């Protein structure tokens, strides 16, 4: 998983751009199951449904952009507008590979956070009008302290659990942008999709970091309890 600082933003012609292109008034919408997208990150996706493959074919011939939106119920395979969250992320196809089983695997570069304002098409795939939801950030000593606390706690978690790759440690330690840091950690942390969505929907970076502090503290508590249980079990086995 990469931060925005590691990525090269390209246009429809494949040439580098100076920054994210302006948000268009409408885009195709790709529903996601069990995945909450975040800005600044590269997101691996596997697509197999006919309507999703049609969407990809069409956006590839345009500017390669679409909106990624998480479904409210991961058990629904083909959610309609009523079963999707209103806030998602613009994605740009960075790499695409078709596999023998007929599905497509792709890497999508997360862009701006957007809100769906109106659904304009349901077939052959979803299309909606959108508006950008930019971050609200005010530099302060409080924000700096929150960034340091989030980094410190997350790095402690990385050293304690196997599900977080070691390269995350270096990435988190070197990110200076508070918003990018929050997106990376929110995506990597083992929390529920609903909790990830709440973090995505929070435009105030300071409030987002405060919520992350709470979630990170909870994860540390869970890790501590798990370690204590393992120690107790091992002690009983040694006695036996």
Task: Annotate each PLM feature.
Residues 1-240:
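N-terminal low-complexity, acidic/polar interaction/targeting segments
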